[in-house]
Amino acid sequence: MKVLFDTNVLVYDTIENSPHHDSASELVDKSADPMINSLSIVELGFVLPRYGIDNESVRMKIDELLHSDYFTVSWLSGKMMEKASTFVVENKLSFRDFNDWIIAYDAYSRKVPLATFDRVLHNKCKKLGIQVIEI
């Protein structure tokens, strides 16, 4: 099944002592057609160092995702940002979470489920009719 992963799934998959590592790794490994938004690659660049990951390891992870034969990268475009911002306004959402809504909107527009460990985002997506995977 095609699925778009939120950044937190990639973070937990990467960090072996993270609370959801096993679940994230299993989800990533079992996905037949996994997708990531390029914004998630950017977010990994500033999230992973917060967990003590050194710069070289972060660079290697970014390179791995950019050149992956496993993940399909959905490249963030101006058009996607315009549509996501309209989606935020129309649904009275907060731009404080614009990064999350860009990724969620990407899944919504492609009609693929979003996989996220963010319970608040998960619940809001369900209310808005965005498919989410129960993790």
Q: Would you name each region that the model predicts?
A:
Residues E43-V89:
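Active-site-proximal, substrate-binding regions of enzyme catalytic domains
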Residues H21-A24, I41, I62, M81, ...:
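A general structural signal for well-ordered alpha-helical segments in protein cores
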Residues F5-D6, I36-N37, L93-D97, D118, ...:
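Histidine- and aromatic-rich ligand-binding microenvironments
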Residues D33, P113, Q131:
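Residue-level detector of anion-binding/catalytic polar loops
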Residues M1-I36, Y51-M60, K127-L128:
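Short, well-structured N-terminal submotif of metal-dependent ribonuclease cores
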Residues I36-L39, I102:
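Aromatic- and histidine-enriched alpha-helix N-cap/loop-to-helix transition segments
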Residues F71-V120:
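Active-site neighborhoods of divalent-metal-dependent phosphate/nucleic-acid chemistry enzymes
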Residues L10-V11, I41, L121-H122:
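A generic structural signal for short hydrophobic patches within well-formed alpha-helices
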